[in-house]
């Protein structure tokens, strides 16, 4: 009898890129070319598990004490949260840039624990990480919230790209 070992597939999620990439309207020349929508994070976790066979999903997020209930909900859905302290920017908004944490986790801290990785971000800042993991045979997919906010640096990785807006009907919070 043939025995296939289960693969460990980890998801590394840029929460801010996911949130803004799905929820904000995008205009070009005064016309709305992308209508934002509310992503259901519980459905999204199931989507990652079912479609990509993700065994662990890391949600990288800036920590704001008032959002504790939301964080608890994310944990209950199955996400492992990785927090970054936030600072207040000049506009009075909390900012917690998590790019370095994603790179650290994916390329060092968790590298030997997973067979393949799925990334959720349209950010070109991860270009060198994707190249590194591609050479190691560990890059499975890059899920991009919408095609209008993805970095052109990701063009090289077209075979890995999945556009989340195409799954809106399945993943939208009603």
Residue spans for each PLM region:
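Domain-level signal for Mg2+-assisted phosphodiester chemistry and nucleotide/NA-binding surfaces
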Residues: 1-94, 98, 135, 139
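Nuclease catalytic cores that cleave nucleic-acid phosphodiester bonds
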Residues: 65-174
